[in-house]
């Protein structure tokens, strides 16, 4: 019965977007509206796979025989989950700012050199090189990618983003640490490592996954109604998935 309930909407859609969980489900439609490509308005079905159970859905699209696969495009959004030790207490915000940011540098290197979750290669292999399937993965997690996408070389431009404003409201004490880090840099644009450090510190200011997704979603909807000037950048892999389904 579950399979029938899930499959039925797919059959009447123009395309399908598969995401890991309810947090992404809340956000992707709002993200698509920010770039004027509403998934719902374009009849794209958003499917919450309840974790990372993508394989059963890939099988609906991966046959080399066109008569044995669904005809619409399918995009899959997933995290690469490098360096799972980042969840440990030694990498919380207070620890990251100690000893001249020693743990922050370790966290950055751990993520940059960490092994990509094997799920990504498995999904790529299972897609069977079918042009109707696109696997879109982002380094670490969605929450980190959101922060990274909204940090720029110019410090003032970073502070003017909607994301910076939101996290400032949610966690002012944490964002004081972000401000302090940036104020300690020279009066110049930030390099790549420094931008990533700021993104990591912002990421560590966030509340739990579900709370952040719900709060960000409401905040973006309100901001988009108030202002025509979008001050929020989508993570690249999310935008790639949307653009694939809605060229």
Task: Tell me the role of every PLM-derived stretch.
Residues 1-247:
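Acidic, divalent-metal-binding catalytic cores of TOPRIM
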């Amino acid at each position: 019965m579950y399979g029938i309930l899930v499959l039925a909407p797919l059959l009447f859609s123009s395309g399908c977007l598969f995401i890991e969980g309810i947090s992404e489900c809340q956000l992707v439609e709002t993200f698509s509206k920010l770039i004027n490509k509403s998934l719902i308005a374009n009849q794209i079905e958003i499917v919450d796979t309840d974790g990372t159970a993508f394989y059963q859905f890939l099988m609906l699209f991966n046959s080399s025989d066109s008569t044995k696969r669904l005809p619409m495009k399918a995009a899959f959004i997933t995290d690469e989950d490098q360096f799972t030790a980042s969840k440990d207490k030694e990498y919380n915000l207070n620890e990251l700012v100690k000893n001249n940011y020693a743990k922050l540098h370790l966290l950055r290197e751990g993520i940059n050199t960490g092994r990509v979750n094997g799920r990504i290669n498995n999904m790529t292999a299972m897609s069977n090189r079918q042009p109707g399937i696109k696997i879109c993965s982002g380094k670490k997690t969605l929450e980190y990618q959101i922060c990274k996408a909204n940090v720029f070389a110019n410090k003032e431009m970073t502070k003017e983003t909607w994301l910076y404003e939101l996290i400032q409201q949610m966690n002012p004490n944490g964002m004081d640490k972000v401000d302090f880090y940036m104020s300690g840099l020279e009066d110049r644009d930030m390099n790549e490592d420094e931008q990533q450090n700021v993104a990591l510190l912002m990421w560590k200011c966030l509340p739990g996954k579900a709370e952040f997704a719900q709060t960000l979603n409401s905040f973006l909807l309100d901001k988009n109604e108030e202002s025509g000037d979008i001050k929020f950048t989508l993570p690249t892999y999310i935008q790639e998935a949307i653009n694939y389904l809605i060229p």
